[in-house]
Amino acid sequence: EIASCLVGSEMCIRDRDNVLYKNNHFENYTSLGLNPHYRLENDDWKIRIGALVDMAFGFGKKFRAAPDVAVEYNFSDSYILYAQAKGGRLQNDFRRLETFCPYGQVSSQPDATYEQINAAIGFKASPAIGLWLNLYGGYQNLKDDLFFQPADLESAANEYSPMLSIGQWNTSNIYAGAEIRYGYKNIFSFSATGVYRNWDAKDDSQSNAGAYALVYKPAFEADLHIDVHPVSALLLNLGYRHISREKVEGNKVDAVNNLYAGGNYEFFKGISVYARIDNLLNQDYQYYWGYPTEGINFTGGVSFKF
């Protein structure tokens, strides 16, 4: 038996962004991310020790750093113990703000959200062909995390209109989760995940921003998804997504309960039709403050791949 080992170190540029705005209320800036790290790999161990170094020029906090550490130990075939500590910058450009809340508005230029640390330990196992299990738990700390809250927009005529204001606050959470995946010969696949989080946002101010920052945070998330290929050209899927919210000052936002189904049929190479039905249970819930989700709703279309 021949053992193999890989050892190496690198200093690489992880990302670089040059952002120019035409809006006079927003400053142009350049951000640079470096990722020095050391790697060691052999038949049983995978070790990575490094750091994520983020610098900003023109706007934002000038220097931030987070760990980039990962350790895996394969103590038996398809049984893995692992630990990791990650982090890094999440750039709050217009694209991310739109994804976070398409109805929200900012009153001033937001700084980048910084994941100071996301540390976890876990166990992965594949006790049977096509079956994978993953159990994990950890801690996450976010600086300048995004949140939204109701506010009033004052016009030039001193009239007020309701709006969603996007703000930032420091948050943290302890989490534990599990995942199971199974696949059979590209005919059937099943996945189920569940994550519990206990959030905290320390707030000594009078604005109550810390409480607002947690109102829509997920306390428990669960996802179930099934894909079936009865024939190679046809894909059918069924899924369920549940999100219960953090309890804040004795109250909780209604949980998300979305049962959905869909399908995709490729009738020519690269050309397919698709359809999806959401909220089959016709539940009343919100993803964004003050914007109720539609009841049973349907989307469909044609997809072209080149």
Residues of each region from the PLM?
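Single conserved hydrophobic/aromatic residue that forms the stacking wall/gate
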Residues: 1-8, 12-13
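Hydrophobic, Leu/Ile/Phe/Ala-enriched alpha-helical segments that form helix-helix packing faces
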Residues: 1-4, 36-38, 123, 127, ...
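Surface-exposed extracellular loop regions of Gram-negative outer-membrane beta-barrel proteins
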Residues: 10, 17, 25-56, 187, ...
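Exposed, low-structure sequence patches enriched in small/polar residues
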Residues: 13, 46-48, 54, 58, ...
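Helix-rich catalytic cores of soluble enzyme domains
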Residues: 15-31, 63-72
